[in-house]
Amino acid sequence: MKIIRIVTSLFASLALMAGISSCSIYNNLVELDEQVSAQWAQVENQYQRRYDLIPNLVSTVKGAASHETELYTQVAEARAKAGGVIKIDENILQDEEKFAEFQKAQDSLGGALQRLLSVTENYPELKTNQNFLALQDELEGTENRISTERKRYNDIAQKFNSEIRKWPGVMFAGKMGLKAKPYFTAAAQASTAPAVQF
């Protein structure tokens, strides 16, 4: 009788420990998934900030460099394309193809802005325009924020992806419908060093 009680207590203790451990693993995965979503919202927030700055920047530059219409068209098209994918639902984090489309549109917009800013160097009157200088500083700060938020997103996505691939997280991830989150990568042109001429 005493042995049966000890064995029953032992199994009950093991079942309780397994239950507590399962709850802990489940809660950890939920928390990491929420952190990824929250960090993704910060990335979107900074892209939206850049998106909102562009019309003011373009209109300021247009005043001084009105004949650069092709460049303005490129910036407007890149902005429209980026705006079309900026508010994709959270499922973008589950679909690597949509994520790549989002990143490509944002990289294209960033490239168009860089071309716009490099063209402005040909117009000395812009260098004295306080509104332009303030917008340029704000855009530069926004680009830095985007870079920071992308890195933070990649960090938390890496932590999440590691947890759902390791045991015992892998057992829960499938049942919870959790998939690996995609990472931001460098733009294709970033792997080629720019040519510097003196």
Language-model segments: which ranges?
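A helix-centric hydrophobic-segment signal that preferentially recognizes long
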Residues: 2-198
